[in-house]
């Protein structure tokens, strides 16, 4: 909120926040069975809060600035095989994401091609949220 006066001084452009599918959906705890991994409540709460903050900010700094969020699905980063296999089996594209999978949607939201898009959260999750 302290930055709002600076943003209101005629800045133009796009802000793209990176949230998570766990800011939208609850965890599937069966994925974590037999692993040391977890899904902290604070992570889900902060990502859900970031999505709502993006909406709030879009209604506050528009029309000169657009604000959107991207919610990635699971990114392959050396997770245990059991987790990865269960995750991929539950994802329609049958794989976890790489960081490269998000560049297209971020570039779109940052560009003028999305000039009428603000206050949105786009899930990029290989279809995870389609079930």
Segments predicted by a language model, with ranges:
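A conserved structural motif in NAD(P)-dependent oxidoreductases
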Residues: 91-102, 113
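Short C-terminal tail/terminal secondary-structure segment
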Residues: 27, 34-36, 107, 118-131
């Amino acid at each position: 909120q302290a930055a709002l006066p600076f943003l209101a001084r005629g800045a133009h452009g796009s802000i793209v926040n990176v949230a998570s599918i766990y800011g939208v959906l609850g965890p599937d705890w069966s994925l974590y069975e037999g692993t040391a991994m977890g899904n902290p409540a604070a992570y889900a709460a902060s990502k859900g809060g970031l999505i709502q903050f993006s909406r709030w900010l879009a209604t506050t700094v528009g029309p000169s600035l657009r604000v959107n969020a991207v919610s990635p699905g699971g990114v392959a980063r050396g997770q245990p095989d059991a987790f990865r296999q269960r995750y991929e089996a539950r994802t329609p594209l049958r794989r976890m994401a790489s960081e490269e999978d998000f560049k297209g949607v971020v570039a779109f939201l940052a560009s003028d091609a999305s000039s009428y898009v603000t206050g949105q959260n786009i899930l990029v999750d290989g279809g995870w949220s389609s079930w």
